[in-house]
């Protein structure tokens, strides 16, 4: 049971609701790209992102404390035609009836997509460009066969990154990041191909930062508008706090635990609008959030109970995000999973134990709301407190499948063997599903997933699928003819 009526109500809506396709982001992205033909790709993408931040509806749902949504629905499944649109066109007429991960999509939305979105992207999507570069027989194996799962890697973005809250995002905020990029842009002369590319990058950073800051401003304005007409004084106070939080973050460094929670969600939401990437990991949440928690509790601004409610609200936000995938991908990755791996516990950079009050709150929030996100991981070391081990065991005993338990020393050793410094290796977090990872580096842990069982099947069945009879493998002879 959730810690409050608020989070329990949101949890029930999450559990019993079916995600709905939103065409808004795709429509904005398409119109922006029509307007920026001929400009550098990073700049075009940044302008499309900024347009989405400025035009998508700023919706605050009843009772919310953490705000921000990628479409007009609480669980919006957005489309990414610049990555891939052909599978959506083939499958969207049966989205609501497929057995795994169905989506609601109206006839009007389908007609709009086919008339106003797909025509522009025909021949321009990442999918089409990628498949054209491959031999035909190879390309055929990569799409919806269950033999080589490659299509899930380019129908939506694969993130496999951990935002650096400790050293970049929280200390600077997006305004300072923007100003630094603008300074680099001004200092970089357009006198070489390399510098022209650098200028495009810096320009795109400026535009993207302006976009995410404007998105937050719009939520602040909407919260203020709702507060002005709110009759309930308690809810009015909450809306005013939301307005203040969104006026502050993510443009500026957070000052309170609530601001830090909202900052984290704006980072996730920005990535959703940009690429909808899976495996965008919140990282070592209990480490970078604890200073705000401790300061607020000491100052009397926050109670552990209120902190738990805020974390539950954030967990629900993580779970409302929808990874829009094909029916074939859903057969293997069912559950609307985004693989947002959040890690608690483990050693600090100096080698001391990092378990704190927030580590326990994260466990309790996961047990309370019972959401599928974030993917909660715990790091267990030889000096882990017994109380934390018992709390982890209690959560495991509920049968939820959380948390994933990882050997702290093994994770650090893997990064040491990869060449990381000891302090960085000790600061590892889990990435996606699942690999030890450090927040200052990106990863690409799998360009394709190989079904070795299918390889054996084709070898023993003359290169043909036992499901369809289609010859997809090498034309091997019958097994009884093997020497």
Predicted regions and their residues:
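Extended non-globular scaffold/tether segments
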Residues: 203-214
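Solvent-exposed, amphipathic alpha-helical segments
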Residues: 222-226, 292-295
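A conserved hydrophobic secondary-structure block that centers on an alpha-helix together
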Residues: 226-234
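Conserved catalytic cores of very large enzyme subunits
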Residues: 2-205, 234-241, 245-483
């Amino acid at each position: 049971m959730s810690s409050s009526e608020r989070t329990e109500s949101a949890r029930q809506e999450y559990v019993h609701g079916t995600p709905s396709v939103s065409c808004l982001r795709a429509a904005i992205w398409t119109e922006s790209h029509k307007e920026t033909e001929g400009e550098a790709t990073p700049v075009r993408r940044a302008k499309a992102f900024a347009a989405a931040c400025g035009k998508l509806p700023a919706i605050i749902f009843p009772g919310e404390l953490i705000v921000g949504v990628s479409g007009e629905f609480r669980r919006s499944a957005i489309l990414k035609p610049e990555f891939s649109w052909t599978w959506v066109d083939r499958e969207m007429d049966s989205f609501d009836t497929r057995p795994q991960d169905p989506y609601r999509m109206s006839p009007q939305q389908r007609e709009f997509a086919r008339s106003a979105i797909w025509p522009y992207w025909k021949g321009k999507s990442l999918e089409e460009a990628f498949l054209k570069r491959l031999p035909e027989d190879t390309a055929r194996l990569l799409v919806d066969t269950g033999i080589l799962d490659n299509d899930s890697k380019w129908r939506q973005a694969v993130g496999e990154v951990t935002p650096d809250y400790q050293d970049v995002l929280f200390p600077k905020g997006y305004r300072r990041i923007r100003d630094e990029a603008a300074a680099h842009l001004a200092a970089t002369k357009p006198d070489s191909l390399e510098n022209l590319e650098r200028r495009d990058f810096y320009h795109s950073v400026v535009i993207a930062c302006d976009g995410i800051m404007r998105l937050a401003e719009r939520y602040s304005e909407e919260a203020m508008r709702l507060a002005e007409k709110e009759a309930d004084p308690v809810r009015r106070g909450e809306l005013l706090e939301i307005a203040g939080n969104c006026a502050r973050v993510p443009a500026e460094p957070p000052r309170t635990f609530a601001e830090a929670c909202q900052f984290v969600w704006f980072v996730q939401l920005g990535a959703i609008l940009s690429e909808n990437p899976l495996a965008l990991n919140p990282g070592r949440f209990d480490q970078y959030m604890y200073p705000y928690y401790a300061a607020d509790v000491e100052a009397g601004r926050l109670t552990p109970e209120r902190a738990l409610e805020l974390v539950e609200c954030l967990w629900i936000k993580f779970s409302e995000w929808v990874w829009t995938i094909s029916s074939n991908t859903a057969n293997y990755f069912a559950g609307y999973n985004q693989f947002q791996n959040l890690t608690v516990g483990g050693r600090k950079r100096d080698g001391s134990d990092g378990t704190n009050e927030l580590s326990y709150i994260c466990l309790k929030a996961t047990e309370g709301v019972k959401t599928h996100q974030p993917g909660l991981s715990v790091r267990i070391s030889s000096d882990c407190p017994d109380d934390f081990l018992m709390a982890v065991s209690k959560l495991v005993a509920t049968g939820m499948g959380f948390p994933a338990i990882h050997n702290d020393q093994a994770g650090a050793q893997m990064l040491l063997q990869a060449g990381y410094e000891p302090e960085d290796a000790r600061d590892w977090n889990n990435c996606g599903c699942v690999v030890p990872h450090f927040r200052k580096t990106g990863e690409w842990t799998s360009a394709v997933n190989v079904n070795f069982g299918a390889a054996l099947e084709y070898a023993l069945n003359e290169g043909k699928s036992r499901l369809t009879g289609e010859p997809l493998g090498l034309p091997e002879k019958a097994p009884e003819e093997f020497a």
